Amino acid sequence: MKVRCLQTTGEGFFKEVEYEKNEPAQDEIEVRAVMTGVCRSDIDMMSGDFGPLPLHMQGHEGLGIITRIGSEIHNVKVGEYVATRGEPAYADMYNVRKDEFVPVPTAHPRYILEPVACGIHLISQNLNEFQTRTGGRVLIIGSGFLAWVARNKLLDYHFYVDVLGNHNINLWGTELIKSVKENYDIVIDLSGKYQIGTDIKLNNNALIIDAVGKEVSRGEAEQQLWRACTTVRPSPRHKNFINAMWDAKNKIQMGNLDVDKFWTQAYNRDTEWQQAFADGMDRPNGYSRGYIVWD
């Protein structure tokens, strides 16, 4: 089946192309796109700072309606809404493998679960590492959406948390700091702008969550080696990421996590998709996260 898809090759823009969608496999569902979030990584890919990924991997913050179900899938039905991690979510229709989708009650941007799950997964992918440091001091570098979700997840445990950043001051209040004076047991790096171990002081056996793929300098490496640090890199391709998606759904549905204020702008797929990526790049006043809507 040939369908439309939005693609970037890293030349500063997205374009509409034709995508050949295969028949869904026995362990897949077919979905029709309803909403897809514009991720910062898509903007980085557009500007040439990342990738570009092949066409079949473009768009990953999906919400769709099921149109067909493989014979090995038994927990959903045709016509049901699902949040997807599968790709390409910028296509009009796409297939999603089992354990890469979660049924949701309605087509509302709060149920674009993949980016929420990314924030939760910063903690849950290596939960045992956090648990062995319970009661320690945590630094989150960055004050955007992922930082806020990660901070919310940390409320399930007992940590002293600082958030280092300059954005969303009204959201964070006194929890937001502009410089650090403490030594930390855990650092969650969503920025890549600081030297972890030199600019940011660490305690022995510290845990570093590198969420940006930062290049480590020699000075950092020496300090991290001296302090016997552990570094992990969370990924939505981890086998347990689906658990973070379920956690995101449950927190949102139960009212324990309010993400509505972050989804600030919707864009019509037929007439406004180019503006969606332009605003993702320029981030006009009041913009937090945008999403594309199919009729």
Where are these regions (language model features)?
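Glycine-rich phosphate-binding loop and adjacent beta-alpha segment
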Residues: S191-M254, D295
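Hydrophobic/small residue at the entry helix of a nucleotide-binding pocket
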Residues: C118, F145-L146
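C-terminal hydrophobic helical "lid"/dimerization subdomain
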Residues: I242-D295
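Adenosine-nucleotide cofactor-binding segment
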Residues: H121, T134-S143, R151-T198
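Glycine-rich beta-strand-centered segment in the early N-terminal region that forms part
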Residues: E20-G37, S47-P88
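Short glycine-/small-residue-rich Rossmann-like dinucleotide-binding loops
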Residues: G37, D44, G70, S191-G192, ...
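NAD(P)H dinucleotide-binding glycine-rich loop of Rossmann-like/cofactor-binding domains
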Residues: Y81-I140
